[in-house]
Amino acid sequence: MTAQSSFLQLNSIFISILIEAIPFILIGVILSGIIQMFVSEEMIARIMPKNRFLAVLFGALAGVLFPACECGIIPITRRLLLKGVPLHAGVAFMLTAPIINPIVLFSTYIAFGNRWSVVFYRGGLALAVSLIIGVILSYQFKDNQLLKPDEPGHHHHHHGTLLQKLGGTLRHAIDEFFSVGKYLIIGAFIAAAMQTYVKTSTLLAIGQNDVSSSLVMMGLAFVLSLCSEVDAFIASSFSSTFSLGSLIAFLVFGAMVDIKNLLMMLAAFKKRFVFLLITYIVVIVLAGSLLVKG
């Protein structure tokens, strides 16, 4: 590959990642603005279960209602945490929302030739990962682990006329978009560079057994940084090369952690927390993928 052709490939991949991700970032920041202006701390306190296990389950299942990609889920989760949602419930929501929503599950069903087993494995493992991690975090951390746990001037905005609330929603969405947008651009560029200059054949050569093939597919998912609505179509193209377990690892891990949303997490949360969270995700997704047969 010549320098010119590789640059053109990098450029096209970079732009395609941005085009794919920006609509979901917009959805995420708009929902974040709506939560800020229309949802009060009192409302959160009323609906959130006090029991830690029920709170984690509530957060995980709430992901069904939000057709959010992993690109847009960080701003929503951050806003919910600022509104008083416990960390364990917020993280459970953050991990499941990009996977168990109907749009993603339907695209998985179509991509794998109407195989319900793949849908159940993907949704089931995602739910299990989020529940286990949520419970662990409920014992490990007492605060929300945000870098900026409080935002002066961002309280009690839920009072005012509808027009004032809509104006506030728009202002918050714009601020949030520019806040997370720079990390999306950096992440998209790194992902494009790795896709251009790291050969897929190198990764394929490493995956010779169940453990290594799952790790390779998780690494590939991290590098490719695909949105969860389309990643199943890429995963299905590896069906003849990799086991179903490693494909499920690709589908679950990639929707929870990739280059662009890692940078967004580092911008929102404390670094130690992000490191621990990703460690938990890697270990539990890997263990779960080894149990998948088919």
UniProtKB/Swiss-Prot annotation:
Bilayer topology: Multi-pass membrane protein
Keywords assigned: Cell membrane, Membrane, Transmembrane, Transmembrane helix
A Pfam family recorded for this sequence: ArsP_1
Signal peptide: none
Disulfide bonds: none
GO-annotated cellular components: plasma membrane
Intracellular or extracellular location(s): Cell membrane
InterPro entries, A to Z: DUF318, UPF0718
Transmembrane segments: 15-35, 54-74, 92-112, 117-137, 174-194, 215-235, 247-267, 273-293
Family membership noted in the UniProt record: Belongs to the UPF0718 family.
Record protein name field: UPF0718 protein YcgR
Species of origin: Bacillus subtilis (strain 168)
